[in-house]
Amino acid sequence: MRKEERLEEITKLINKRGTIRVTEVVERLKVSDMTVRRDLTELEGLGVLTRIHGGARSNNIFQYKEMSHEEKHSRQIEEKHYIAQKAAELVEEGDTIFLGPGTTVELLAEEINKTTLQVITNCLPVFQILSQKQSETFRVHLLGGEMRSITQSFIGEITNIVLEKMHFSKMFFSGNGVKGNEVMTSSFQEAYTQKMALGRAIEKYLLIDSSKIGKEDFTSFYQLSQLTALITDCQDDDKLQKLSKYTEIIN
């Protein structure tokens, strides 16, 4: 089991039970005592839990209950359409692009109107939208793996092994929150896959609506300063000024 998978399992367990013991985590995850203690120390550093004798106690910070795919589709619709249209202007003929999961990225998939393109995605809805546009010069690839139902995206070792062999001219992705320089999401595993894809893209564009600016989530997985640009509907001058310290803003 990879580290990000262990951290996610431990987080789920401790937030369900309130407290956990090292011995029960060792037995549940089939890893060493030392590995569990290192994981608990890392999660303590993230503010997820507090170490106590023989185990840990939840800090109950996992208060950001991730919305379902259907709920996300009903929020900030006009704003997401605006962002998707702006992002679509950056897609060029001949590009090889990676599209991550997220309802705003799905809207981008609908907006794409190029005829010579290669698109790779780990998101089932994005693939379903783009597969309607396939041709000899418009190719769409879906990465398989373990399905994360809440975002309908594929994650895990199989997904990541395939990703390691790929390179992209551009990547468009989203997140659940942006705070300071940090881009945040709810899942270690999904974050790991997103970060891996970002490392293989030349240009990197974050699609984020104004409701997510200033919002925290469970784990940080990328920094604004590493982006090519952030695409948003936000018109708040104060927020835009703060964001522009880290990256270019397209709005």
UniProtKB/Swiss-Prot annotation:
Disulfide bonds: none annotated. Keywords: DNA-binding, Lactose metabolism, Repressor, Transcription, Transcription regulation. Gene3D superfamilies: 3.40.50.1360, Winged helix-like DNA-binding domain superfamily/Winged helix DNA-binding domain. Residues 3-58 form the HTH deoR-type domain. It holds the Pfam family DeoRC. Residues 20-39 bind DNA. GO terms for biological process: lactose metabolic process. InterPro entries: Carb_Metab_HTH_regulators, DeoR-like_C, DeoR_HTH, NagB/RpiA_transferase-like, Tscrpt_reg_HTH_DeoR_CS, WH-like_DNA-bd_sf, WH_DNA-bd_sf. GO terms for molecular function: DNA binding; DNA-binding transcription factor activity. It comes from the Bacteria. Repressor of the lactose catabolism operon. Galactose-6-phosphate is the inducer. PANTHER family: GLYCEROL-3-PHOSPHATE REGULON REPRESSOR (PTHR30363:SF4), HTH-TYPE TRANSCRIPTIONAL REGULATOR SRLR-RELATED (PTHR30363). This is Lactose phosphotransferase system repressor. It comes from Streptococcus mutans serotype c (strain ATCC 700610 / UA159). The lineage of its organism: Bacteria, Bacillati, Bacillota, Bacilli, Lactobacillales. The gene is lacR.
